[in-house]
Swiss-Prot record:
The record marks 151 as: Transition state stabilizer. One of its GO terms (cellular component) is cytosol. Belongs to the PNP synthase family. One of its GO terms (biological process) is pyridoxine biosynthetic process. It comes from Prochlorococcus marinus (strain MIT 9303). The gene is pdxJ. The keyword Cytoplasm applies. It is found in: Cytoplasm. Its EC number is 2.6.99.2. Pathway: Cofactor biosynthesis; pyridoxine 5'-phosphate biosynthesis; pyridoxine 5'-phosphate from D-erythrose 4-phosphate: step 5/5. CDD domains: PNPsynthase (cd00003). This is Pyridoxine 5'-phosphate synthase. Keywords: Cytoplasm, Pyridoxine biosynthesis, Transferase.
Length: 245
């Protein structure tokens, strides 16, 4: 049974749209936990477009589940992670003009530099996950980097038309099995919604799904606690086939 990590970046997006103090993502993280979140995920981007350094400091002091810090593989971010000591770091690619993370890390092309950062973080007691596309080459490179986890990028599945969704789901199944055969633990996320999450949640071997935008969007109608509860029910009791159409 997969657990649920709730990404609260989009709460900070609303705040930053007006450069004001609300909504504050810190108390919203508590509401997500009260709704059943097994962890809180935030992405501290280099341009600080949503989550701010102070948010991260306060979340570290208040989150009672698990704090997963998504960040670019840069010396600045490694230094912040070593100071904050999140429960996990997920290394992700960043491009300044992107609206959201557009793809997985090219671990195979950056293996040397990534290995140094992975080692530095894990020696400090912070488990590292690499956000990768569901491709064998990237999984093998992730294993060689020394990371203990991967997070499979589910964007291609989430964005596929119904005719291609089964193919993308099969890729995720195969990638999960391959990662586990390499000794990696597996999370997944990106673009998952109330309509498409169940088939991914049913994949044997995926330990946690990280989901944000759809939960925050749903919370406008029903409140954050209920939005998290609804998603948690789908993640914990999934149908075995994707809902097409």
């Amino acid at each position: 049974m997969a657990s649920l990590g709730v990404n609260i970046d989009h709460i900070a997006n609303v705040r930053q749209a007006r450069q004001t103090v609300e909504p504050d993502p810190v108390p919203m993280a508590l509401l997500a936990e009260l709704g059943g979140a097994d962890g809180i995920t935030v992405h501290l981007r280099e341009d600080r477009r949503h989550i701010q350094d102070r948010d991260l400091e306060l979340l570290r002091a208040t989150v009672r589940s698990r704090l997963n810090l998504e960040m670019a593989a840069t010396p600045e971010m490694v230094g912040i992670a070593l100071k904050i000591q999140p429960d996990m770091v997920t290394l992700v690619p960043e491009r300044r003009q992107e609206v959201t993370t557009e793809g997985g890390l090219d671990v195979a092309a950056q293996q040397g530099s990534l290995k140094g950062m992975v080692d530095q973080l894990q020696v400090a007691g912070i488990p590292v996950s690499l956000f990768v596309d569901p491709v064998s080459q990237q999984l093998e490179a992730a294993c060689k980097s020394g990371a203990r986890w991967v997070e499979l990028h589910t964007g291609a599945y989430a964005e596929a038309c119904w005719a291609n969704q089964s193919f993308e789901l099969a890729r995720l199944n195969e990638a999960t099995a391959r990662a586990r055969s390499l000794g990696l633990r597996v999370n997944a996320g990106h673009g998952l919604t109330y309509q498409n999450v169940e088939a991914v949640a049913a994949i044997e071997g995926i330990e946690e799904l990280n989901i944000g935008h759809t939960i925050v969007a749903r919370s406008i109608a029903v409140g954050l606690q209920e939005a998290v509860r609804e998603m948690k029910r789908l993640v914990q009791n999934p149908r075995r086939e994707p809902l097409f159409g």
